[in-house]
């Protein structure tokens, strides 16, 4: 996958052998342009950058509402957890969810650092293999909540052909 950010392109390797349903969802949403223009609504320095709210977080959509970004998802059903032994280390891409382990839908995050407390609690399904320096430049939010007032956004996200 190629994730275009304001500072450059990020190449993400997906692990369909570990989390086939999450990889399929990620590719489906990306290749139908649903992630384009979606903001990084929660970015915590020393932890991760969260994005992927295609409902309220898409800055090009009529439903865009930064205050509600992070509460929405796609019109597809939630996914069942696909926990694995893939460690949440720097550059790992994982699906965000509510307190229900089977509630992942469209939101995802990229780890800035190792986050072992997430291991086997969130579905990791990919890893940044090039361009992590551009992920590291994503605008950070409030130190407590991670809320970003004028957030960076995904320019585009597509499968590599």
Identify the residue ranges that each predicted region occupies.
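Cyclophilin-like peptidyl-prolyl cis-trans isomerases
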Residues: 1-161
């Amino acid at each position: 996958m190629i994730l275009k950010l304001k500072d450059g392109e990020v190449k993400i390797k997906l692990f369909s052998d570990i989390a086939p349903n999450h990889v399929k969802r990620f590719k489906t949403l990306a290749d139908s342009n649903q992630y384009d223009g979606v903001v990084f609504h929660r970015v915590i320095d020393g932890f991760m950058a969260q994005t992927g709210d295609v409902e309220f977080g898409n800055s090009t959509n009529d439903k865009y509402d930064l205050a509600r970004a992070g509460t929405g998802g796609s019109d597809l059903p939630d996914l069942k957890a696909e926990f694995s032994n893939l460690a949440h280390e720097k550059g790992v891409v994982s699906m965000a969810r509510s307190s229900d382990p089977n509630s992942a839908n469209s939101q995802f995050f990229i780890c800035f650092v190792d986050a072992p407390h997430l291991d086997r609690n969130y579905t990791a399904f990919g890893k940044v293999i090039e361009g992590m320096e551009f992920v590291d430049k994503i605008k950070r939010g409030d130190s407590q909540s991670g809320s970003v007032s004028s957030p960076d956004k995904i320019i585009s996200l597509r499968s590599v052909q």
